[in-house]
């Protein structure tokens, strides 16, 4: 006998011999089937087969990773049974990372409005009309960008004992929105998670969209042919970037400023010389107290054929390009079958920086430059500074530097892909940056080229300073007085004003100035100005605004008074009044910033 009626016609009466379902479970099953059919009968439009219509709208949104921005105030997740979002009670999640019942179609349409690097010129131009930087995404979209890191294939936090409701198969329209969440000890939602006690975690594995952006940036700073191909993806920016920047009422975005440097470099080097972070930097002696020994240092570098053959055994094979610049190329090196502590075999990755000799550079200056950079970087040992491992010569006679590999990419790409960072995430990176700068200054080293492109990130959010090609040793261990620096060094938006107007200056406030500009770039997604000179209207507006009661609008938008006061002090145009790194860390704002566990300073 089959119980056939209007509500359960498709559910036959089960016999105890075939099924062991209790009557209560069977009743719930029939009730769910009944409500499902009633929902279908009320609409002629069938939902996609991969969407569970019994899930409430808010839960459904969270399950598919469809986020809409609300407020940036953290709140407690009150539904511990929600396995699609944060599944444990007592976890904080910023509300701008939470879903607010968006429809599936509207979220897909919103995501389609974001620029894709592989789109045609016409579609790219249409997406770029509202902003000079068309690659900026909303803060919530930045969470979807990193969703690939949470898939079983790429996750570093997967658990074989995970028990969650199977997610529906993603369709072409929502493939970029699906967050595959696992029930780990620390539930993940996108790239940033805040716990109830105020601690947080970063998950910065690059996603496809971020990888495309990173590839385009590599091409931008590569040969002229590659730059031409990359420019085709952003025609509105390339059309007349100088006019665009001047006509815009807002300061230039990070990407627009980067594009301006690329175009300016094309004008300066029509043959397609690669760009560099160091602009108009004069030749100088890094180790002024040890100039005579710098030439002899090259004899300690690996040069024999036998040693070159040992490189593959020690560091593995070099593969894809990670970055390009005037110095040369950075490649990733993979060494397989590395024994781990648990006895299993794994792989280890390294970054290999290939030095290139400049056209107007003699062999002696070339050797001095690379050995000076290697000596400085290899002598610095800090959590927030990239570890330099080795210096050797390849088969072509080019010198190469081996460094640790940072899987999270660089801060520039992250900010451009996200549009801007919320304060908790930016504060964590900022405090790590200041810790690294304080350590450098204590060691008598000044970087002089701090910018988001030279700040690397691990997959778990540890910030590391890299590229010491322009760094200086301003004080040796046995010296009491510092050596003053001179010349203009670095990328123009981050160059301190004293570099333009003084022949000699203390290099330490120069790094602090750059850190202040970097923080504002993280929080606003824009550069404060093109250069800190009197002919720059944005810089002049800043000088005027900092003296007025209302302040300078971009800095005033930070809302927190403690933060604003420190940033104003870091960006003081008078160098000797500028706050130093230790004062930043000891300020009220500096003390209240909570770094992630992996970002805590370990010397």
Swiss-Prot record:
Binding site for ATP: 322-330, 353
General remark: Present with 1030 molecules/cell in log phase SD medium.
Gene Ontology molecular function: any one: ATP binding
Gene3D superfamilies: Transferase(Phosphotransferase) domain 1
Pfam family, one: Pkinase
UniProt keyword terms in alphabetical order: ATP-binding, Kinase, Nucleotide-binding, Serine/threonine-protein kinase, Transferase
Compositionally biased intervals (Low complexity): 159-171
Physiological role: Promotes K(+) uptake, by the potassium transporter TRK1-TRK2, which leads to the subsequent cellular resistance to toxic cations such as Na(+), Li(+) and Ca(2+).
GO BP term (any one): G1/S transition of mitotic cell cycle
Domain Protein kinase: residue ranges: 316-590
SUPFAM superfamilies with a match to the protein in the record: Protein kinase-like (PK-like)
EC number: 2.7.11.1
Compositionally skewed regions (Basic and acidic residues) per UniProt: 282-296
Disordered: region residues: 1-86, 150-171, 267-301
Active-site residues, record numbering mapped to chain: 449 (proton acceptor)
Gene Ontology CC: one annotated term: cytoplasm
Stated name of the protein: Serine/threonine-protein kinase HAL4/SAT4
Membership in a protein family: Belongs to the protein kinase superfamily. Ser/Thr protein kinase family.
Reactions accelerated catalytically: L-seryl-[protein] + ATP = O-phospho-L-seryl-[protein] + ADP + H(+); L-threonyl-[protein] + ATP = O-phospho-L-threonyl-[protein] + ADP + H(+)
Disulfide bridges in this chain: none
Residue ranges with Polar residues bias: 1-15, 30-60, 68-85
């Amino acid at each position: 006998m089959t119980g056939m009626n209007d509500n359960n016609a498709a559910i036959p009466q089960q016999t105890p011999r075939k099924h062991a379902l209790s009557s209560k479970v069977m009743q719930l099953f029939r009730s769910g089937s009944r409500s499902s059919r009633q929902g279908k009968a009320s609409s002629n439009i069938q939902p996609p087969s991969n969407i569970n219509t019994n899930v409430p709208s808010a839960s459904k949104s969270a399950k598919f990773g469809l986020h809409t921005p609300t407020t940036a105030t953290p709140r407690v997740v009150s539904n511990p049974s929600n396995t699609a979002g944060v599944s444990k009670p007592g976890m904080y999640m910023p509300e701008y990372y939470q879903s607010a019942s968006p429809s599936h179609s509207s979220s897909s349409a919103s995501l389609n409005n974001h620029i894709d690097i592989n789109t045609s010129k016409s579609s790219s131009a249409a997406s770029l009309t509202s902003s000079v930087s068309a690659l900026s995404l909303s803060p919530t979209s930045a969470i979807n960008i990193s969703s690939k890191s949470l898939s079983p294939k790429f996750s570093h936090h997967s658990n074989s004992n995970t028990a969650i409701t199977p997610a529906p198969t993603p369709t072409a329209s929502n493939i970029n929105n699906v967050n595959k969440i696992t029930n780990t000890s620390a539930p993940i939602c996108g790239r940033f998670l805040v716990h109830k006690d105020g601690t947080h975690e970063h998950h910065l594995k690059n996603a496809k969209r971020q990888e495309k952006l990173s590839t385009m940036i590599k091409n931008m700073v590569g040969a002229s042919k590659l730059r031409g191909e990359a420019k085709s993806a952003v025609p509105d920016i390339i059309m007349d970037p100088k006019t665009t920047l001047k006509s815009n009422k807002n300061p230039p975005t990070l990407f627009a400023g980067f594009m301006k440097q690329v175009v300016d470099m094309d004008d300066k080097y029509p043959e397609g010389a690669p760009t560099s972070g160091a602009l108009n930097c004069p030749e100088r002696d890094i180790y002024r107290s040890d100039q005579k020994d710098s030439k002899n240092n090259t004899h300690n570098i690996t040069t024999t054929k036998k040693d070159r053959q040992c490189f593959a055994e020690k560091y593995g094979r070099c593969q894809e390009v990670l970055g390009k610049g005037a110095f040369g190329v950075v490649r990733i090196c993979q060494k397989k079958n590395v024994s781990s502590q648990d006895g299993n075999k794994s792989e280890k990755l390294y970054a290999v920086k290939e030095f290139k000799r400049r056209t107007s550079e003699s062999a002696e200056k070339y050797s001095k430059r690379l050995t000076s950079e290697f000596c400085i970087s290899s002598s610095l040992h800090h959590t927030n500074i990239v570890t330099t491992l080795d210096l050797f010569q390849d088969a072509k006679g080019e010198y190469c530097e081996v460094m640790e590999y940072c899987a999270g990419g660089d801060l520039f790409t992250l900010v451009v892909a996200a549009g801007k960072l919320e304060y908790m995430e930016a504060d964590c990176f900022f405090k790590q940056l200041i810790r690294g700068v304080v350590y450098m200054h204590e060691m008598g080293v000044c970087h002089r080229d701090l910018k988001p492109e030279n700040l690397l990130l691990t997959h778990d959010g540890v910030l590391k300073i890299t590229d010491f090609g322009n760094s200086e040793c301003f004080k040796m261990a046995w010296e009491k007085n510092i050596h003053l620096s001179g010349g203009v060094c670095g990328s123009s938006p981050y160059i301190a004003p004293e570099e333009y107007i003084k022949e000699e200056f203390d290099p330490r406030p120069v790094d602090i100035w750059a850190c202040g500009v970097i923080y504002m770039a993280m929080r606003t997604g824009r550069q404060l100005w093109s250069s800190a000179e009197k002919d720059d209207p944005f810089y002049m507006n800043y000088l005027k605004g900092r003296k007025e009661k209302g302040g300078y609008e971009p800095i005033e938008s930070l809302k927190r008074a403690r933060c604003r006061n420190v940033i104003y002090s870091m960006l003081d145009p008078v160098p000797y009044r500028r706050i130093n790194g230790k004062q930043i860390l000891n300020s009220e704002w500096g003390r209240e910033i909570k770094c992630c566990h992996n970002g805590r300073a370990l010397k």
